[in-house]
Amino acid sequence: MAEERSVSRIDELRQRIDDIDERLVELLSKRAACALAIGHEKKLIGLEVYQPSREAEVLGHVQRINPGPLDNEAMKRLFERIIDEARRLERVADTDEQAG
């Protein structure tokens, strides 16, 4: 009986994770669209894709607002990866404009 409750609770928690993952994908896609637009704007005004001060600002911000349970280093690593992908999209925007 306790085992059934535990299995049921695990299933419930997994469903919550699936729901959260769907929201994360949606939000990451919106963030990526913004990065692509930023890439276009940077190209228009001649800015470099890589902006170390902005990256430091973003990483500092996410660490300040981090409520846990992930520690700040884990959060930083996650956002470094997100930023890497955003930078890749900005470069794609730059390349697309040069090709077009």
Whereabouts are the PLM-identified features?
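Domain-level signature for soluble enzymes in the chorismate/prephenate branch of the shikimate pathway
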Residues: 1-100
